[in-house]
């Protein structure tokens, strides 16, 4: 297997620390809201990596944490008049439900930050004892100047972190790049039960120390792969390396670093101010199948930016329809026997830096072969291989009958679209526009194509 290692900046062969047990850590969600599709992209990509590693090696320990203590969580709890557990329990449950709908496997371990506070405190004390952290007014800071290799992941020079004389250094810091390991409790923390006793007083951990502590707790000082979104590369992952390597001299923390690219919506970064934050829950509740969302997320290479726009779903729907249509043409039982093998071409694509779009293109080549051949045995064999291989990628999870089952609402929508088409043909543009507006009021958006056909999707 070959993967692109952010740490070295090149694709390199994957050489495990121990071939009998591959160790992987991935940064999971911060549970203050429903997970958005950018978060979901990361979860789905590393789900495929997990599946691949399980295929290639006898044992894989996959740890994906949950950040359940954070400023954003505290803000939501305060606004809602709840404690942090009341907030996080709702969104942890929702996260699990949403990821199940995207056909994601459960990780081996899914630790919560609040269950590992003592591990964090012990790690912080180690850093203080080794001269890599200092206490100022009940706040513990990491001293970036104590770690000469700081910046190795993000390729930043520590001097770049000096912002200039016009920007004040945060109170208590010795260097602008120093970051918080432990912060003292506020009145709000006490009220919301978001603080714990420590040698430095009542308080709560900084974000970065959480992942260092949980990865150490479940994977030890060194492990094979650390994954996450490109937005976490700096400062989060850079700080993780610094903390962990300083707490355990001689360690290197993670051997391979994998980062998935950014996801935008209609060419723009998702943000509350733009009102374009798109959650998995919104898509599912609007009628978009989880398998369709997963297909879109896998159809762009994980390191490339992915722009989510309305026609993306239309195109993905057509692609999956093509696959299910091919399966519907095979008039035999397609239940899988144990001897049905995965497509080696697809596995090879995944072994080449998790190339999921190329793997999907191989699936479509198989569909073409199914459609071309009239040999029943060959068609059946190809169909079974297609199902087995697609299932490995987490798609084609339905029977073709279930996939194409149309509900009454869909039939009504298609009927209105047909009426609109006739109205346009008769130059009755007012009626056509009235139908468009009626559908829009029901959350149905129409997209007219150059060939005269019309696609629709739920916004």
From Swiss-Prot:
One of its GO terms (biological process) is cysteinyl-tRNA aminoacylation. Keywords: Aminoacyl-tRNA synthetase, ATP-binding, Cytoplasm, Ligase, Metal-binding, Nucleotide-binding, Protein biosynthesis, Zinc. A motif ('HIGH' region) lies at residues 29-39. This is Cysteine--tRNA ligase. Monomer. InterPro entries: Cys-tRNA-ligase, Cys-tRNA-synt_Ia_DALR, Cys-tRNA/MSH_ligase, CysS_C, Rossmann-like_a/b/a_fold, tRNA-synt_1_cat_dom, tRNAsynth_Ia_anticodon-bd. Belongs to the class-I aminoacyl-tRNA synthetase family. The gene is cysS. GO terms for cellular component: cytosol. Its cofactor is Zn(2+). ATP binds at residue 272. PANTHER family: CYSTEINE--TRNA LIGASE, CYTOPLASMIC, CYSTEINYL-TRNA SYNTHETASE. Its EC number is 6.1.1.16. A motif ('KMSKS' region) lies at residues 269-273. It is found in: Cytoplasm. Zn(2+) binds at residues 27, 211, 236, 240. It catalyses: tRNA(Cys) + L-cysteine + ATP = L-cysteinyl-tRNA(Cys) + AMP + diphosphate. One of its GO terms (molecular function) is cysteine-tRNA ligase activity. NCBIfam families: cysS (TIGR00435). It comes from Ehrlichia canis (strain Jake). The keyword Transferase does not apply. HAMAP family: Cys_tRNA_synth (MF_00041). Binds 1 zinc ion per subunit.
